[in-house]
């Protein structure tokens, strides 16, 4: 049973997928956001191709724990995914994941232009690994 993670950005969506044993997260793709309908259609195909049974969505709240406009957008996307695709969506606190992703990409000596494109995918990996690690503690 695979888990898919989504890091919803302003222009791009980062995607990461777990291995079938739900131990390791790996980066999958970065999609340009071209509207909700396009996103859900592409996501539905991805869910079928990878036999995803659970989706984790980065939950953007401020460092002080307050919700904002992006939080509302992410909630809306979660509701859309659940209603159209029929897979439960769980939220994972994504505070500082973009900064952590940027650091990983810098350490990997990735060029600035490519870093900008890859940071959402790397953030999705961090979100998913955080979720997988916390799930393994529950069992």
UniProtKB/Swiss-Prot annotation:
The cellular component terms of Gene Ontology attached to this UniProt record, alphabetical and capped at eight, are: cytosol
| EC number per UniProt | 3.1.-.-
Q: What class of enzyme is it?
A: hydrolase
- Write down the InterPro entries for this protein, in alphabetical order: RNaseH-like_sf, YqgF, YqgF/RNaseH-like_dom, YqgF/RNaseH-like_dom_sf
State the signal peptide span: none
* UniProt entry keywords in alphabetical sequence: Cytoplasm, Hydrolase, Nuclease, Ribosome biogenesis
Q: Where in the cell is it found?
A: Cytoplasm
Q: Which SMART domains match?
A: YqgFc
Cystine residue pairs: none
Report the principal subcellular site: cytoplasm
The record ties this protein, via SUPFAM superfamilies, to:
Ribonuclease H-like
Q: Which GO terms describe its molecular function?
A: nuclease activity
What's one Pfam family here? RuvX
Superkingdom, taxonomy of origin: Bacteria
Which GO BP terms, alphabetically?
rRNA 5'-end processing
By sequence similarity, the record places it as follows: Belongs to the YqgF nuclease family.
Q: What does this protein do?
A: Could be a nuclease involved in processing of the 5'-end of pre-16S rRNA.
Classification via HAMAP family? Nuclease_YqgF (MF_00651)
Q: Which named protein is this? A: Putative pre-16S rRNA nuclease
Name the species this protein comes from.
Dictyoglomus thermophilum (strain ATCC 35947 / DSM 3960 / H-6-12)
